[in-house]
């Protein structure tokens, strides 16, 4: 039988000092010997997806203590990618993922906690906590803050749904009046919660359901809805059940690495492709797999992307549907159910929500197409109130009916899929020998094949200036390089360049290629994660203005139409620059010591932009 980790600091005469300190936190004599459950919260007033999390730790703690555990809460950081976007702050976003993972590990291991509840929500927080959970391998349950309600406003007497990206595009579009731009801005983000489309935050929170580490509804139940309260309480109860099974019954099947197996990662990626999730999820799944010691690679992602259809289309790929609509259609469990009926899902994997241990039983209960449970149907009818608020659980509105239309609804069956090609694709070729990622869900059909002329920039800032200044014209392939994990450093998101291409009427007239990454809010022919990155000697660092680039998404290829001999000549010339080789010589960018430390160990995107541990073992 596994011994409680916390016994290290609570048992024996030599731990008198530690017990004295535990008592000073409120632990009583009768509590010693109970499992200590860490609650990793990420409350902050900087981020709308986290502004309502202050009291969530206490809610989870109450359920833990009622079930016989000791709950101890701590906090970690959370960066708002939207607020950090378009300036030097974005350099810190991806590196914060590693910092979050480390901080959770530090707190849990320093205090010998027995199990963990992760209260996350936005872009790098869920991935960082996921990496920590798989690294620690103790019983864990994830519960997120939930998505924001979609913004809504009237323009030209027509009610439209909005999100953050709409506000950005409108602000840069000279055809939109100041009054309408301000109206969109004021309506785009009406409530607390993660941004309302299938952006990175919501994508990752959905993927925790598919990985088996969070409860049904975690990725789709609105932050404002009263029903979400039960998810926090159940997370506390559930983690205690897992802890008792592991420490009391010696049942290792409840541990994160037993749950998040290779098959579970395949399920998560299948969900991602089916729902057209953020391209950032590829980065984070690769990083999480390495922490879990699961051999899940870009090759696996490519294989899955070729066979899984696009079953759920959500903003930013369409203005019609947001996360509130995904929930009404049955949420993640409904998409997984359709994948199962298509023969594209492993249902024999473990899941924290299962009483018998398998995803199959979870689907039988929570797939709205299968279940007759009226409580489950009522749960998925939870809808928006349309009232601006920063308060969680502030409303109890419900849709009159579920969206169970699998022919023309938000979630489709395989037969009526939005496309038989999935929502993400891996491209490769001489421009990206180790691959790159495109969110095909957001690509216009006319752009699935594209050939254009390179317009090269060595920073996001220069690219923005070039787009807004009229340098970029129809037929160009905008290349933004030296923005990878090492070269940025920090692998900035390129939401502003893609948004400005749209606002200039070039959204379907140009392509954008980068060794950086894209916001989950990006759509259009935007190809990121080019690996190897320029700073690591990637071919993207050798592209010159005027070079022709061919993109073939159906053929999964991306080619720089320059001869091998010419590329060898350019590479030799670059290497001859010595210490200045593979660096953006025209760019002036202050880089802090913290970011330099990150850059020293950062790998390219095809490895998840994780740290190269071989450099630590040297």
Swiss-Prot record:
Family the entry assigns: Belongs to the IlvD/Edd family.
Source species of the chain: Shewanella amazonensis (strain ATCC BAA-1098 / SB2B)
One example of a Gene Ontology biological process annotation: L-valine biosynthetic process
Disulfide bridge partners, by residue number: none
Function of the molecule: Functions in the biosynthesis of branched-chain amino acids. Catalyzes the dehydration of (2R,3R)-2,3-dihydroxy-3-methylpentanoate (2,3-dihydroxy-3-methylvalerate) into 2-oxo-3-methylpentanoate (2-oxo-3-methylvalerate) and of (2R)-2,3-dihydroxy-3-methylbutanoate (2,3-dihydroxyisovalerate) into 2-oxo-3-methylbutanoate (2-oxoisovalerate), the penultimate precursor to L-isoleucine and L-valine, respectively.
Record InterPro entries: Dihydro-acid_dehy_C, DihydroxyA_deHydtase, DiOHA_6PGluconate_deHydtase_CS, ILV_EDD_C, ILV_EDD_N, IlvD/EDD_N
Catalytic activity: (2R)-2,3-dihydroxy-3-methylbutanoate = 3-methyl-2-oxobutanoate + H2O; (2R,3R)-2,3-dihydroxy-3-methylpentanoate = (S)-3-methyl-2-oxopentanoate + H2O
GO CC, any one term: cytosol
Keywords from the UniProt entry: 2Fe-2S, Amino-acid biosynthesis, Branched-chain amino acid biosynthesis, Iron, Iron-sulfur, Lyase, Magnesium, Metal-binding
Name the UniProt record assigns to this protein: Dihydroxy-acid dehydratase
Gene3D superfamilies on file: IlvD/EDD C-terminal domain-like
Coiled coil: none
Name of a matching Pfam family: ILV_EDD_C
Residues that span the membrane, as ranges: none
Cofactor: [2Fe-2S] cluster; Mg(2+)
Positions annotated to bind Mg(2+): 81, 123-124, 493
Enzyme class: lyase
Positions bearing N6-carboxylysine: 124
The UniProt record lists the keyword Magnesium: yes
Residues given in the record as [2Fe-2S] cluster binding sites: 122, 195
Assembly and interaction partners: Homodimer.
EC number: 4.2.1.9
Highest taxon, organism lineage: Bacteria
Cofactor annotation comment: Binds 1 [2Fe-2S] cluster per subunit. This cluster acts as a Lewis acid cofactor.
Active site: 519
NCBIfam families xrefs: ilvD, PRK12448.1
């Amino acid at each position: 039988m596994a011994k409680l980790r916390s016994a290290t600091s609570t048992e024996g005469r030599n731990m008198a000092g530690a017990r004295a300190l535990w008592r000073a936190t409120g632990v009583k004599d009768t509590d010693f010997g109970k499992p200590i459950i860490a609650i990793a919260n990420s409350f902050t007033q900087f981020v709308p997806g986290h502004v309502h999390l202050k009291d969530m730790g206490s809610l989870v703690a109450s359920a833990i203590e009622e079930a016989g555990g000791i709950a101890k809460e701590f906090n970690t950081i959370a960066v708002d990618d939207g607020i950090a976007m378009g300036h030097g702050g974005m350099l810190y976003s991806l590196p914060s993922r590693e910092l979050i993972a480390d901080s959770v590990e530090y707190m849990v291991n320093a205090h010998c906690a027995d199990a963990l509840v992760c209260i996350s929500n936005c872009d790098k927080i869920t991935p960082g906590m996921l990496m920590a959970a798989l690294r620690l391998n103790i019983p864990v349950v994830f519960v997120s803050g939930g998505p924001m309600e979609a913004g809504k406003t009237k323009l030209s007497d027509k009610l439209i749904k909005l999100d953050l990206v709409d506000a950005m595009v409108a602000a840069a579009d000279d055809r939109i009046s100041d009054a309408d731009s301000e109206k969109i801005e004021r309506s785009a983000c009406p409530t607390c919660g993660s941004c309302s489309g299938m952006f990175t935050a919501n994508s990752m929170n959905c993927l925790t359901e598919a990985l088996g580490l969070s409860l049904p509804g975690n990725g789709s139940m609105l932050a404002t809805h009263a029903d979400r309260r039960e998810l926090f309480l159940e997370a506390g109860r559930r983690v205690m059940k897992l802890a008792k099974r592991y420490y009391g019954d010696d049942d290792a099947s409840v541990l994160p690495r037993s749950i998040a197996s290779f098959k579970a990662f395949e399920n998560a990626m299948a969900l991602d492709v089916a729902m057209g999730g953020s391209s950032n999820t590829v980065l984070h799944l690769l990083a999480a797999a390495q922490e879990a010691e699961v051999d899940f690679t870009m090759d696996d992602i490519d294989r899955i992307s070729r066979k899984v259809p696009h079953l759920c289309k959500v903003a930013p790929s369409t203005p019609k549907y947001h996360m509130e609509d995904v929930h009404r259609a049955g949420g993640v469990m409904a998409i997984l159910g359709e994948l199962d009926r298509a023969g594209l899902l492993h249902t024999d994997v473990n899941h924290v929500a299962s009483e018998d241990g398998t995803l199959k039983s979870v689907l039988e209960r929570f797939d709205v197409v299968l279940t007759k449970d009226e409580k489950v149907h009522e749960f998925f009818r939870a809808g928006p109130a349309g009232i601006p608020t920063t308060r969680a659980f502030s409303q109890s509105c419900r849709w009159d009916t579920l969206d169970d239309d699998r022919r023309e609804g938000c979630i489709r069956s395989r037969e009526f899929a939005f496309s038989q090609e999935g929502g993400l694709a891996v491209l490769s070729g001489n421009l990206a020998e180790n691959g790159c990622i495109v969110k095909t869900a957001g690509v216009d059909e006319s752009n699935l094949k594209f050939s254009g002329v390179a317009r090269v920039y060595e920073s996001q800032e220069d690219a923005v200036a070039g787009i807004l200044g009229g340098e970029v014209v129809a037929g160009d392939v905008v290349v933004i390089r030296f923005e990878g994990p090492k070269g940025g450093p920090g692998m900035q998101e390129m939401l502003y360049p893609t948004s400005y291409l749209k606002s200039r009427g070039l959204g379907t007239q140009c392509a954008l290629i980068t060794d950086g990454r894209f916001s989950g809010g990006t759509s259009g022919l935007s190809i990121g994660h080019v690996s190897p990155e320029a700073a690591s000697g990637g071919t993207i660092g050798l592209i010159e203005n005027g070079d022709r680039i061919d993109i073939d998404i159906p053929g999964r290829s991306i080619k720089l139409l320059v001869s091998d001999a010419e590329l060898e000549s350019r590479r030799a010339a670059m290497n001859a620059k010595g210490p200045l080789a593979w660096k953006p010589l025209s760019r002036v960018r202050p880089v802090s010591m913290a970011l330099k430390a990150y850059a020293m160990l950062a790998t390219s995107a095809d490895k998840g932009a994780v740290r190269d541990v071989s450099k630590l073992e040297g």
